Amino acid sequence: MDRGCGTTPIYKGGTLPEWATINAPSFLPYVIATPEIAMGYLFTYPLAAGLNANTKILWYVATPRGGYALEAVGHPLGAKSPTASFSKAADSGPGEIYPTGPTVPSAGCWHFILVWQNGAQHADVDLLFKS
């Protein structure tokens, strides 16, 4: 669908991992993290930059959450600052999902590290935010 940014393309359609199909909004564009153990459905596309932006990504993870939150920290690709972060408790279902509303202070390609299972699992994803 779109080349996305960094190493993370944006897809629409195609074959989804089985763990990411439970009540999935498969009609939406999505990103797949590296390694392929997390993916996010983009309810807001394109993602908007700005601290008051209304964004929504529904993350699916391939491994049990174990009751632990999803934690994410990001920065513009190729820079160490500014930073942005979000977290979501493991309180949604069905399936291994985390609905989030990430915000970033400026437009561009942002690299996030997603962490869950109390740090046992992690994946990288690049997300394009537009002004």
Question: What is each residue range found by the language model?
Answer:
Residues M1-P105, C109-S131:
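Contiguous segments within soluble domain cores/interaction surfaces
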